[in-house]
From Swiss-Prot:
GO terms for molecular function: protein homodimerization activity. Gene3D superfamilies: Phosphate transport system protein phou homolog 2, domain 2. GO terms for biological process: intracellular phosphate ion homeostasis; negative regulation of phosphate metabolic process; negative regulation of phosphate transmembrane transport; phosphate ion transport. Keywords: Cytoplasm, Phosphate transport, Transport. This is Phosphate-specific transport system accessory protein PhoU homolog. Pfam families: PhoU. Belongs to the PhoU family. Its main location: cytoplasm.
C-alpha cells in the first residue's frame, strides 16, 4: 500500500501490533485481487460464453472464503487480546466490514457464473449488451475501490458513489424493460434469470461503494 493501514496506529511502542496488522492488510489486498478475478470470470461466463469459468470461480471462492475467515479471526484476536484504543477499533471494525463486502461480491460472482450456465439454453437477448455495460461499470467500481484502498484515498467514498449512480440508473431502466417482457406470453425463465443478473450486479456495485466509503472512514474517521 502507498500508505500502510498500520500507519494509522500512532503508538510506536506497539511494533508487534503493527507487524501483525501489516500481514492482515496484505491478506485484504490478496482477497481483493481474488474477488476482482472472480468478477472478471463471471463476466466472461455471461457475455463471452466461457463456460469453463464457473468451475474456476468456485475454486476461487474457496480461497476467498478462507481468507475472509482468517482476516475476521485475526481482527477479532486483536480486539480481544491487544486492548485496542479508539483509533484501533475504528480501523479494525472498518477492515472487518470491508472484507465482508468483498466476500459478498465473491458470492454474487459465483451465482452469476451459475446463471450463465442456465442462460446458454436460450438465444441471446437484446438486453444483454446493456447488461454487459452495467457489469463493466460495476467491475470498474470494484477496481477503483481497491485502488483507493491501496492509496488510502480520503475521497474514495465520493468518487465511487458517483459511479454507483450510473449502475443504479441502468438497473432501473433494465428492470422496467424486463418486467414488461415478463408479461408477454412466451418463455419466462430467461427474463427472470436476467432480472436476477442485474439485481446481483446492482448489489455488487453497492458493496463496492461500501468498500470505498470504509476506506474514507479509515482515513478521516468520518462516516459518509
Amino acid at each position: 500500500m502507498a500508505a500502510s493501514l498500520s500507519q494509522q496506529i500512532n503508538n510506536p511502542e506497539r511494533s508487534y501490533f503493527e507487524q501483525a496488522l501489516k500481514r492482515v492488510e496484505q491478506d485484504v489486498l490478496r482477497m481483493g485481487a481474488l474477488v476482482e478475478e472472480s468478477f472478471r470470470m463471471s463476466h466472461q461466463a455471461l457475455f463471452e460464453n466461457r463456460l469453463e469459468t464457473p468451475l474456476k470461480i468456485a475454486e476461487l471462492e474457496k480461497e476467498i472464503d478462507r481468507l475472509y475467515r482468517h482476516i475476521e479471526q485475526e481482527c477479532a484476536s486483536f480486539l480481544t487480546l491487544q486492548a485496542p484504543v479508539a483509533q484501533d477499533l475504528r480501523l479494525l471494525s472498518a477492515i472487518m466490514q470491508l472484507v465482508r463486502d468483498l466476500e459478498r461480491i465473491g458470492d454474487y460472482a459465483q451465482d452469476l457464473g451459475e446463471i450463465a450456465m442456465k442462460l446458454t439454453r436460450y438465444p441471446p437477448h437484446p438486453c444483454m449488451d446493456e447488461i454487459a455495460a452495467m457489469a463493466w461499470q460495476a467491475q470498474h467500481m470494484l477496481d477503483q475501490s481497491l485502488v483507493c484502498l491501496t492509496q488510502l484515498d480520503p475521497n474514495a467514498g465520493e468518487i465511487v458513489k458517483k459511479m454507483d449512480d450510473v449502475v443504479d440508473d441502468a438497473y432501473d431502466r433494465l428492470y422496467k424493460t424486463l418486467a414488461f417482457q415478463r408479461d408477454i406470453k412466451g418463455v419466462v425463465e430467461p427474463i427472470l434469470l436476467m432480472a436476477l443478473v442485474i439485481r446481483h450486479l446492482e448489489r455488487m456495485a453497492d458493496h463496492a461503494t461500501n468498500i470505498a466509503q470504509r476506506v474514507s472512514y479509515i482515513v478521516t474517521g468520518k462516516r459518509e
